[in-house]
Design a protein with these regions (language model features):
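N-terminal segments that mediate ammonia production and transfer
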Residues: 1-86, 99, 108, 112-113, ...
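Generic hydrophobic alpha-helical scaffold/packing signal
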Residues: 54, 149-152, 208, 238, ...
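Structured helix-beta-strand junction loops
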Residues: 60, 87, 176, 256-257
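Glycine-rich phosphate-binding loops that contact phosphosugars or nucleotide phosphates
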Residues: 86-232
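Acidic catalytic cores of enzymes that act on phosphate-bearing nucleotides/polynucleotides
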Residues: 115, 255-268
Length: 268
């Protein structure tokens, strides 16, 4: 089936042969709306790949295309993104795991392109150390990460505007945050994240561009160049994935190393 009922905290679902009943915290029947889930059986198959992670690495070009689709326009330089809070003078990003690394990249991009100060906190630490003002951007692939949900609830208690970047429509985070922004990658089964990580960075880049235009940090000409580059991004990814054999050779040389140093600067 592609039909689902989403449960809220404290609700109980009773499944019988021909009946589904949902009870609220007080034991009273709750009227729930069925929603269509955008997925196909092919999403849960390896489609000839050795494992799901390899499949999802190769799905990155289409994932980036879907994340950008309808959100960028070259005809008239514009970022068509969900309505963002007009006053985003200060941003805190909360996330866990791979999404936290996407947030680190997002901090660099937003500060560079929009001039907006960005703070980043592990979601599990936000309630203790995080800033309780401005806009909070929560990043979670599943939309169900407990620490991220807890951080958003904490932020809302202090009146923060909240944005959720997630991959799953109807997930818990989308019902809590003020604005959900979907990465639209399709199911990701492999761990650690692959296509959802790159799509999260793409969405953060769009946020940076929109803020950069609002803050007068980016000209129309600059935006045109960025949008043109974003449109070519799926083909760039295809080009890199076409060098898989070379990459496998390098991986083969590294696989038995006891330690590896990654050295970079800036966003790297």
């Amino acid at each position: 089936t592609n039909r689902a009922i989403h449960l809220n905290d404290g609700e109980i679902c009773i499944l019988k042969d021909n009946n589904v009943k949902v009870l609220d915290e007080k034991g009273k029947e709750a009227i729930k709306e069925e929603r269509a889930v955008d997925w196909s059986i092919e999403d849960a198959e390896k489609s000839g790949y050795q494992h799901f992670m390899l499949k999802e690495i190769h799905e990155q070009p289409s994932a980036i295309y879907n994340a950008l689709m309808g959100r960028i326009s070259e005809i008239e330089p514009r970022i068509n993104l969900e309505d963002l809070e007009s006053n985003m003078d200060e941003i805190t990003i909360v996330a866990c795991g791979t999404s936290f690394y996407a947030g680190m990249a997002g901090k660099y991009i937003i500060e560079k392109l929009a001039g907006t100060p960005v703070f980043i906190e592990l979601a599990s630490e936000y309630r203790y150390f995080g800033r309780k003002s401005g806009t909070v951007i929560a990043i979670t692939q599943s939309g169900e990460t407990a620490d991220v949900i807890g951080a958003v609830k904490e932020a809302k208690k202090y009146g923060c505007h909240t944005i959720a970047i997630t991959n799953v429509a109807g997930s818990s985070i989308t019902r809590i945050a003020d604005i959900p922004i979907y990465t639209r990658c399709g199911p990701e089964i492999g761990v650690a994240a692959t296509k959802t990580f790159t799509a999260q960075i793409a969405v953060l880049f769009l946020i940076a561009l929109k803020l950069g235009m609002k803050n007068l940090c980016i000209s129309n000409g600059d935006l045109q160049k960025y949008v043109s580059s974003l449109r070519r991004l799926p083909s760039y990814l295809e080009e890199v994935l076409g060098r898989e054999n070379e990459i496998m050779d390098v991986a083969g040389k590294l696989k038995d190393c006891e330690s590896v140093f990654f050295i970079g600067r800036g966003i790297n």
